[in-house]
Amino acid sequence: MPVGVPKVPFRAPGDEDATWVDLYNRLYRERLLFLAQDINHEIANQLMGLMVYLSAEDSNKDIFSFINCPGGSVIPGVGLFDMMQAIVPDVHTICMGVAASMGSFILIGGEMPKRIALPHARIMIHQPASSYYDGSAADFHNESKHVTMLRDYITRCYIERTDQPGEVIQRDLNRDVFMSATEAQAYGIVDVVAEG
């Protein structure tokens, strides 16, 4: 039997009585965001909307993004990364569990030196993939050019945000590279490993 999303009490400023809201809505009010699934358009849009709202509400308060993400779609992931760079508040990224594929790309998007991994977190990087395309050769060629542009952008971001040489990033993105939290810190994906 599924538990569902727990409800917690929340009292808005000026209210005398608390109301019951789902856990995530309560945490969002505290500027705590969660990416705990594959990245798709829906979750990316929700998180980007929350970031814009929280930035407009108070651009001086940091936002904390907790990540337990096995990957997901490239386009929404790049959009989420770009939004993290565009808003005024610093975004802390905290890897809890796994940040793989697009999840690791979101992890590096946090404000330096505010990228954190919990002690037993696992991080995996690799290149963006394109799904099998069932269309004309011209359409496939256009899609492959677009995938190449995205791959180049993601590679540049990893180079800039990890300080690894370009050859290292290009080599490592050509395969699945798994890292522990301490290995990810040495690589430059995170700045801090939280103490257990």
Curated annotation (Swiss-Prot):
Domain of life of the organism in this record?
Answer: Eukaryota
Q: How does it assemble?
A: Component of the chloroplastic Clp protease core complex.
EC code(s) of this entry: 3.4.21.92
Its encoding gene is what? clpP
Stated name of the protein: ATP-dependent Clp protease proteolytic subunit
Where, per UniProt, does this protein localize? Plastid, Chloroplast stroma
Keyword line:
Chloroplast, Hydrolase, Plastid, Protease, Serine protease
Recall the GO molecular function terms of this protein's record: ATP-dependent peptidase activity; ATPase binding; serine-type endopeptidase activity
Reaction(s) catalysed by this chain, per the record, are:
Hydrolysis of proteins to small peptides in the presence of ATP and magnesium. alpha-casein is the usual test substrate. In the absence of ATP, only oligopeptides shorter than five residues are hydrolyzed (such as succinyl-Leu-Tyr-|-NHMec, and Leu-Tyr-Leu-|-Tyr-Trp, in which cleavage of the -Tyr-|-Leu- and -Tyr-|-Trp bonds also occurs)
The Swiss-Prot or TrEMBL record describes its family as follows: Belongs to the peptidase S14 family.
Chief location category: plastid
Give the CC-aspect GO terms. Answer: chloroplast stroma; endopeptidase Clp complex
Does the record's keyword annotation contain Plastid? yes
Q: Could you provide one GO biological process annotation from this protein's UniProt record?
A: protein quality control for misfolded or incompletely synthesized proteins
Please name the CDD domains in this protein's record.
S14_ClpP_2
